[in-house]
Structures are given as C-alpha cells and as structure tokens.
C-alpha cells in the first residue's frame, strides 16, 4: 500500500500514502486560492460601491431612524404607554407610573404602579422606607419616564405632565472601581460631586442612599449637607432616598423639601 511513516505519537503512529499526500497538497492549494479569490472579490465590490458610499450611508441613517421609530411605536402600543405633556415649570406629575423593564419581567398584573407629584413648592423629595421597599425602583421609574419622553417615546403611565430637563444626574447603586483604585465611598463622592457641580435649576438629580459607604454619622452629615445644598443653591427637581430617618426633620426647615415614605406589605 506504499505506507510511509509520517509521525510518531506517544500512543500511535501516523502513516501517509502518495495518494493522501497528493490530496493534502490539492486541499492546501485550494484553500490558498480561495483566500486570494475572496480578497479579489472584496476589492472589486469595494471599488464598485465606493462611488455611492455617501448615498449608502444616508440610506443606512434613514433605515436606522425608521428602526428606532418603529421600536418606540411597538413598545408603546404593546404596553399601553401614553404621550406625555411637557410644561415649562418644575411640575412633574405622573399618574400610575411604572418601571417599563421591571413590569415586563414580573407576572402580568402584579406590578404596583405609583403616582408622582412634584411642584415648585417642594422640588426635593426625601424618600425613606425599608430595604426592598421600592425606593430605588421608584426613582429609576421617574428617570426613565423623563428620558423616554424627551427622546420622543410614549411613557409607561396613565397620565404624564413633565418638564424638559437639560441634564439628568444619577447616583444609584454601590460599587468600587478596582482598576482606578477607588473605593465604594470614593466612587460615590465623585459621582455626587459631578452632579452638584454641573446641575442647574432645570436638571434632574437622583441620589440613592448617599453616605452609606462610610461611617454612620459621617454619612448622615454628608447626606444632610448635600440635600440642603441642592434645596438652597441648585433648586432643581431631586429625588433623594436615604436610610437616615433622622433627616426627615429637614421638611420643617421650609427649604422646599418634602418627606415621602415607601412602605412594603
């Protein structure tokens, strides 16, 4: 059979025949020719469409825009979203507001909707409540409704009368940044500082559990200082959740701060 030893392995021997060597050569040659042919075809197609590249890019942009509009229309229709009304004041009123993502993963009809009523007199909401009581979801829901409305999408609620925000700042969750060598508390302070420095009276600020990354009384002092600064200097719509129930006295200082409580049943 004209077998020739080709390779010795620890548990086997490999042999080859002239016919197999010829077949191997043909296969390798065919693969090389295929790669070269693919490149030739690629360059031909590239040169052919080069003259129309700007037209194709314009078409792609139109298709992308249609895709976005279709997606927004479909999600709004399937989930009974409504068209928001925009106002020029700091009035943020939502009836039966929902978190569009969470309600999709819960059993149908089990999501509990929430109203939102914020006006010029009390633009800052101080939110307290137990863990897993829905504070973070409530705030995320408001941010999503604001963002969805401003990109031209209907929003998940029964009614919505909301302002147009120039910026939305959020400080939600607790995580460190090991790559940058930043602790959980450092990340928290940097993100909060960004909001306090650049927010205007037309911005939306959402702070979730500020100060929990450090000692109890230090965190409480930081949280109080931030909320008082927002209420007296920035004066924008703000949702500030906290587990420091001692801060609820701030409502009595007439700074435009209103206490709200999330209860779990």
Predicted regions and their residues:
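Interdomain "pre-motor" coupling segment immediately N-terminal to P-loop NTPase/helicase cores
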Residues: 55-77
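Well-ordered, non-transmembrane segments within structured domains
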Residues: 51, 65, 145-146
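A conserved P-loop NTPase coupling/switch region
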Residues: 1-62, 88
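ATPase nucleotide-binding head domains, primarily ABC-like/P-loop NTPase cores
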Residues: 2-13, 20, 69-265
């Amino acid at each position: 059979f004209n077998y020739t030893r080709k390779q010795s392995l620890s548990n086997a021997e490999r042999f080859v025949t002239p016919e197999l060597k010829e077949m191997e050569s043909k296969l390798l040659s065919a693969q090389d020719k295929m790669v070269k042919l693919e490149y030739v075809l690629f360059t031909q197609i590239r040169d052919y469409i080069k003259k129309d590249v700007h037209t194709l890019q314009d078409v792609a942009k139109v298709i992308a825009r249609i895709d976005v509009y279709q997606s927004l229309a479909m999600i709004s229709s399937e989930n009974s979203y409504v068209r928001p009304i925009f106002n020029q004041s700091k009035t943020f009123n939502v009836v039966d507001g929902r978190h569009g993502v969470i309600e999709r993963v819960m059993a149908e009809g089990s999501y509990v909707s929430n109203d939102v009523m914020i006006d010029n007199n009390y633009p800052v909401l101080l939110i307290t409540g137990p863990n897993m009581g829905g504070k973070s979801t409530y705030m995320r829901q408001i941010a999503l409704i604001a963002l969805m409305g401003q990109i031209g999408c209907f929003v998940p609620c029964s009614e919505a009368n909301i302002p147009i925000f120039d910026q939305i700042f959020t400080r939600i969750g607790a995580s460190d940044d090991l790559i940058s060598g930043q602790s959980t508390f450092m990340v928290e302070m940097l993100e909060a500082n960004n909001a306090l420095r650049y927010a205007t009276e037309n911005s939306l600020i959402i702070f979730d559990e500020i100060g929990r990354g450090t000692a109890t009384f230090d965190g409480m002092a930081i949280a109080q200082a931030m909320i008082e600064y927002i209420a007296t200097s920035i004066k924008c719509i703000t949702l500030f959740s906290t587990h420091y129930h001692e801060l609820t006295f701030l409502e009595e200082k007439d700074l435009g701060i209103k206490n709200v409580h999330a209860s779990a049943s």
